[in-house]
Each structure stands twice: as structure tokens, then as C-alpha cells.
Amino acid sequence: MQNRTLPYFLILPSLLLAAVVIFWPVVHLFEIATHDVNRFGQLREFNDGANFTALFATAEFMNALWRTAVWTVAVVGGALVLSIPVAIILNMDFYGRSVARVIIMLPWAVSLTMTAIFWRWALNGESGMLNSALHGLGLIDTNIQWLASAATAFPMQILVGILVTVPFTTTIFLGGLSSIPDDLYEASSLEGASLWQQFREITFPLLKPFVNIAIVLNTIYVFNSFPIIWVMTQGRPANSTDILVTHLYKLAFRLGKFGEASAVSLIMLAILLVFTVIYIRISTRSEQS
């Protein structure tokens, strides 16, 4: 009997901590989202879901929702595509490999805010490094306002998002590649397999669990990413680069709509929970089959 109850006693402190740190704030968030709230954060009467209705009736929220989906898919997908070949190269035995790994990982150690500040300066339309380089190469005659135009601001932010996500994703894939036995590659080489065949038949299938981990973690990380969008453009021009997390910030701290901001938080939480559960189930079934 004691052996059966011991595991529950061991995990009890963690459950209590999770209840205090996670579950209670979510319950309080739901309470705020379903009530009218004044600018001082005081709850008024129950509004029967009016905050959620108001959100879906506004074009700003719907545009931010769609843009968040584009932002997440593009950044996560782009980081995966770049990180796999980078990890494969860094996993090879060559002179200076340790230095190359450190260089790749360094951006991960820099805060997102500092990275966003650097890129905001580099993409400045008047004195930015990118325009100066393009002028020097003779590729442009007039300055390009990278962050002042909706057509270029959001794509550049996606590019920055990919670049800052690659180091973490590469680290995950390096861990996966190091677990693949070298004997498999040696045997396939003796049988005349090309590098592409080795990747398709050995590397990628054995790397799939790590790909799944990277997709789930990066989706959560990128979906909630605030500094890149906010520091570079604050959602400008005309809210054309807003995603859900920056839209939430504006609702709460610029417009004082704490009820609607809380509703956005709950919607974001629900989206991530549904995605994570569905993706883990699909990936688990595919591995079992």
C-alpha cells in the first residue's frame, strides 16, 4: 500500500506549485474576461461573454489572429528548414567545429529585445546598415523604408524571427543527430547509398521525434513572442504588423480594456492547448504505426 501511495506524495508538491502558479491565475483570468472591468482593474457585473463577442466583431482582432497564424507557421517552418542542414554540418567532424557551434549558439544567449533593437537599427530607412550595404553594391538608388511599409515590415520581422529561432532548433537537432549510431551510415555507404538516400532513409526518420519536439516548443515560443514585433514596429504601420500578443498589450495598457485583453489571453491559451494535444496525438500515432 505504501509503495502505491508514495509516487502521489512525491508529485504532490509539484501539483500544488502548478495550482498556485498556473491554475489559479487562469481561473482569475477567466473571471476578468467574463466581467466588465474599469480602467483601474475593478470587476463590475457579469457580461455574459460580451468581451469575446466584441473581439470577434473587430477587424483588428481578426487580422491579428490571421497574422499570428502566418507569423507562427512561417517562423517555425523556416527555422526547421534552416536548422536541419546546419545541424548536420555541425555534426560532421571538421577543424573548428567547436568554434562554429559556439558562433551558431551565441545569438541564443542574447536577449530578444537586444536582437530586435539591433535589427530595428539595421533596417532603418535612412541610416540603416542594410540600405548602406545595398547602396554600396549598387543594387538600389533610393533608400527603402523597410519598417515603414506594410509590404516589407512584416516579412522582415518573420526573417528576424527565423534567425533568432535557428540556434535553439539547431541545438535540439544536434542532440538527435548525436544519438544516431555511426554504424548505420557506414553500412549504408558500403551498400552504395548516396548522401540524400542516407538522409531520407536514416537521418530524417530517426530525427523525427526531435523534429516533433522542436515544432511543439517553437510553436509555443513563437506564438507568444512579443519583443521582435513590439520593439521593431509596435504593430505599425496602422496595426499592419500586430499579432495577438501585441494586440493584447495595446488593449490592456493603451486602451484600458482589461476584459477584452483577458479574453485574448484565454483564446491564445486555448489555441496552444488544442494545437499541442492534436499534434502530439498525431505524431504519437505516426510513430506507433
Swiss-Prot record:
Any one biological process term the GO annotation gives: transmembrane transport
Any Pfam family matching the protein: BPD_transp_1
Membrane topology: Multi-pass membrane protein
TM region(s), chain numbering: 9-29, 70-90, 99-119, 144-166, 213-233, 258-278
Cross-referenced PROSITE patterns: ABC_TM1
CDD domains: TM_PBP2
Compartmental location: Cell inner membrane
Intrachain disulfide bonds: none
Keyword Zinc-finger on entry: no
Domain ABC transmembrane type-1: 65-279
Free-text function comment from the UniProt entry: Probably part of an ABC transporter complex. Probably responsible for the translocation of the substrate across the membrane.
Database matches in PANTHER family: BLR7065 PROTEIN, SPERMIDINE_PUTRESCINE TRANSPORT SYSTEM PERMEASE PROTEIN
Protein name as catalogued: Probable ABC transporter permease protein BAB2_0490
